[in-house]
Amino acid sequence: MNFLNYFYHSKKILLQKIDGQFMKVSLNWLKALGNIKTIDIDNKYSTNTAGFEVEAIESIIIGGEIDHILDISSTANRSDVLSMIGLSREVSALTGSSMFQLYINPIIDIFSKKETIISNHDLLNCDNYFAAIIDEIRVKDSPDWLKNRLLSSGFTHRNLLTDISNYIMLKWGQPINIIDLNKINNMNHKNSLTIRSNFPLGSNDQIKLNNENIELNKNILVTQVNTNVTSIAGIGSNSDFDTDYNTKSILVESAIFKQSVVRKSSRVLNIRTESSIRQERGLNVDNWKNAHFEALALITDLTCGNIRDTFCREKITDHALNINLSIKKVHDILGPIMYNGQTRFLFFEEIQNILHSLNFDLIYQNKENIEVTVPNYRREDVFREIDVIEEIARIYGYHKFRSSVPNIQFNKRLSTKRKFIDKSRSILRNLGLTELVHYSLIKSKGNIALNNPLIQDYSNLRGSLLEGLIESNLYNIKQSNQTIDSFEIGTVFHNDQNKIVETTNLAIILGGNLDIRSTWSHPAHSLNWYEAKGIVENFFQRLNRQIEWTKKDILDGRIKFIQKGKFATLIYNNIIIGIFSELNQATYSELGLNTKLFFLEVNLNILEDCHNEFNYLSYQIQPYSKYPSIIRDLSLIIPKNMEIKYLLKLLDQFYDKDLESTTLFDQYIDESIGKEKKSIGLRFTYRSNEKTLTNSEIDYKQHQLQKKIVKQLNLKIRQ
């Protein structure tokens, strides 16, 4: 795919329609940087298996020489290879070549200027910032070598200063802004400059990117020179201050902004640029310095300009990242290789050479262990022992290791956990619920972040199953469909004392549709609390689990879905296993629903605990009574905060051998009953195993029961 057709030829803040994962790479430039004599361009296998993919190869003639242009893609975690320097490091490691000296010596005395023209007012979300004022420049035509480098990378010449900034970004991966100071309001040779990065306070702020007006808001980080908004931080510079052939005085900026802030601005504005792609993935401090020094050297050399003042703000990097590497673990994970028809493991010297080629410093080593220091530009993706082992395999070549399936004796019997999950799934399907399956990766922040996400938008492990079920119902509603009574059984992740714990959860979502009828003659209604709770209780009953429903608060991420005052915490064997609740109003508004939705999420690991499962039921078998039952209803006025479960437990003390069951059938709350009071309806079912009970016998029993309720429980009977 020739993605460079999307480039706007004149600027380095090129607006693109791609994710920025592809680069056009000049083979001649790559060989020059890496001191590489030959590369087999027809054999893409080694590059593809080394973490990069060559999408296409094109041969062109530039400056009278044949050059091969490679379309290369890399993974999201390899921000260090979004530059020719980074790629040349990789190719040098793969081919065993040595890199040329990359360090750029700063121009003599550029930091010893006596003038203090540039002042730092407030650099928000920016820890590393270079700036320099260069005067008396003459913008001439770009030299041929510079034009050729840009042309081979898909850029077209515009003017010398823009070409230099594009060249530096391609070579070092560090965006450079060059601002025409003659276009800054109220700016002359003697004025001082105040630089800042901040969020705009005005409501009508605008900026021109690529000559298009962009509306700003308080969530967009911008940079300013004096009172002029010169760029959207990390994304692109203001077209009003672009350089041209009449430019005489410039401000050269290079900065590293906070990745999350640039990513947020890019999403809000729906703009992806060469600069934002690199800022989002993370920039390297060493490259930042070298890029700025080389930019100043090129500008002063090619424009004959004079550096008037400089400013630098640098965050001191943390201590070196050291990783202990076990040779035995390398052999255990990677396995043996085939060498000259024989099977053997990697030699210690081979591992050493690979680490040296990757610029990993070896600070301690013996035949069993190596302690390595990871270079700064690889600290984003290499910070564990397994990462170092992966690098060894990648450079040596995955295809050189023997591929064999281990001989494992599988136990054909299903585990207790698998049986329990299958049973739960079967019960829920029998109850009429639809099973859904979602990814374990989510967009939400605040969860457990992946170290190596393939897609930045899905870089967190889920801590709950509810978000997936809610999003599925939201999608159905947007497609003019109904909500689905559904469930999901899957793994969730959470931190427990700095350890990542994985559990198997069950989540259910119920309601939302006007399809519940008591009989065909009654109008349809939406699911209410008691009906939803009844479905959940039915599920637990079929699992043979006695669940306690309480009002204990829950403080995890699910609290954002809870409707205040309409939730219950579920307890099994004195352990909180989950929550049942009505969805809150905010979620209703998001879904566009007028009817109620209820959800359940429980930890199946606790429910499945085989130690708590009865192997033999403790029931006593007795024949059903052949005599009819008689029902009596009773209305009581009780405190509003009294739980029905507690009341039924109190009534159990009034034992009557003919009382078969006591159930709640009604609840009524009104000011006429009394403040902090509610009326409930209880249904008492009487049945004898010995005879048919008469009405007079039942009336007497019921009268005695009412007297005990009034006297002993101090409750009022509603007439």
Swiss-Prot record:
EC number assigned by the record: 6.1.1.20
Plastid in keyword set: yes
Gene Ontology cellular-component annotations: chloroplast; phenylalanine-tRNA ligase complex
The reaction(s) this protein catalyses: tRNA(Phe) + L-phenylalanine + ATP = L-phenylalanyl-tRNA(Phe) + AMP + diphosphate + H(+)
Cofactor: record remark: Binds 2 magnesium ions per tetramer.
GO BP terms in the entry: phenylalanyl-tRNA aminoacylation
Domain FDX-ACB: 625-718
Binding site for Mg(2+): D381, D387, E390, E391
Record-linked InterPro entries: aa-tRNA-synth_II/BPL/LPL (IPR045864), B3/B4_tRNA-bd (IPR005146), DNA-bd_dom_put_sf (IPR009061), Fdx_antiC-bd (IPR005121), Fdx_antiC-bd_sf (IPR036690), Phe-tRNA-ligase_IIc_bsu (IPR045060), Phe-tRNA-ligase_IIc_bsu_bact (IPR004532), Phe-tRNA_synthase-like_B3/B4 (IPR020825)
Alphabetical UniProt keywords: Aminoacyl-tRNA synthetase, ATP-binding, Chloroplast, Ligase, Magnesium, Metal-binding, Nucleotide-binding, Plastid, Protein biosynthesis
Compartments (UniProt record): Plastid, Chloroplast
CDD domains: PheRS_beta_core
Domain B5: 318-403
Family in the record: Belongs to the phenylalanyl-tRNA synthetase beta subunit family. Type 1 subfamily.
Protein's name according to its UniProt entry: Phenylalanine--tRNA ligase beta subunit, chloroplastic
Organism: Pyropia yezoensis (Susabi-nori)
The encoding gene: pheT
